[in-house]
Amino acid sequence: MRNVLIVMLGGFIGANLRYWLGEWMSSSSGFPTGTFVINAIGCFLLGWLLTYSEKNRLLSKEWSLLLGTGLIGSFTTFSTFSVETLLLIESAKYIVASLYVFGSIFLGIGLAYIGVRLALYCKKEEDIA
């Protein structure tokens, strides 16, 4: 039960961050900038956090649940991404929808990779020091 409460706390924080950042970044261009940027940031943070904390044994299981599953998990939003893509398609904005889908996938995977590599690099630097 404790772990559930920890995830809920992280989820509360992450969902609020997503809402306020999404509001701040809302755009009239038709491209869902807020969701795109939020998912990209989340991919990088989760890739970095999980790798860095595992390699350096920094986070307890509870902190990993709070930050990874709760905060970052609720901060990113695949369901919103999916609905926004469908709305773009229904509005016959096929090019924008395609850019959004492929951009989100490649940027997300790319930033997750950069986060993992950065965490591994930081670990090597600490081993040298």
Swiss-Prot record:
Explain the regulation of its activity: Na(+) is not transported, but it plays an essential structural role and its presence is essential for fluoride channel function.
| Subcellular location, record wording | Cell membrane
Give the UniProt keywords, A-Z.
Cell membrane, Ion channel, Ion transport, Membrane, Metal-binding, Sodium, Transmembrane, Transmembrane helix, Transport
Choose any GO biological process term that the UniProt entry carries and state it: cellular detoxification of fluoride
The record lists the catalysed reaction(s) as: fluoride(in) = fluoride(out)
**GO annotation, cellular component aspect:** plasma membrane
Among InterPro entries, the record links this protein to: FluC
Whether Ion transport counts among this entry's keywords is yes
The keyword Transmembrane helix is annotated on this UniProt entry: yes
Q: What is this protein called?
A: Fluoride-specific ion channel FluC
